[in-house]
């Protein structure tokens, strides 16, 4: 999965955010990124907060473990997931992205 990388001991995820969507959720792949749809508008950091909350809930980690590393004001972002390796992140995202070969690994 080209959208997952490593920064120190933590995993990083490259995402493409679509704010003001009709519903919040992970929409699948978008090139070499994961597309995330958010109801929030990109005002007062609301979309970034919602994005981190969604990813934390999806991965089953505390919200404080997920942060925006790059792209605070851009649709393309890099999110850091503390305490999770890239392989753990791959396994956790596989069912959501429909990649069964990774889910069973």
UniProtKB/Swiss-Prot annotation:
User: What Gene Ontology cellular component terms go with this record?
Assistant: cytoplasm
Q: Which InterPro entries match?
A: DUF167, YggU-like_sf
Q: Which cysteines are joined by disulfide bonds?
A: none
The cross-references to Gene3D superfamilies, in alphabetical order and at most eight, read:
YggU-like
Record SUPFAM superfamilies:
YggU-like
- NCBIfam families, A to Z: DUF167 family protein (TIGR00251)
Write down the PANTHER family for this protein, in alphabetical order.
Answer: UPF0235 PROTEIN C15ORF40 (PTHR13420:SF7)
Q: Which family does it belong to?
A: Belongs to the UPF0235 family.
Put simply, this protein is called UPF0235 protein Cpar_0370
Record organism: Chlorobaculum parvum (strain DSM 263 / NCIMB 8327)
Which lineage do the record's taxonomy fields give for this organism? Bacteria, Pseudomonadati, Chlorobiota, Chlorobiia, Chlorobiales
């Amino acid at each position: 999965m080209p959208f997952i990388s490593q920064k120190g001991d933590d995993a990083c995820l490259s995402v493409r955010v679509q704010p003001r969507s009709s519903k919040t959720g992970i929409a699948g792949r978008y090139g070499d990124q994961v597309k995330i749809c958010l109801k929030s508008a990109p005002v007062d950091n609301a979309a970034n907060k919602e994005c981190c909350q969604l990813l934390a809930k999806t991965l089953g980690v505390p919200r404080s473990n997920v942060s925006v590393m790059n792209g605070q004001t851009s649709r393309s972002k890099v999110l850091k997931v503390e305490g999770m390796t890239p392989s753990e992140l791959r396994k956790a995202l596989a069912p959501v992205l429909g990649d069964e070969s990774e889910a069973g690994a």
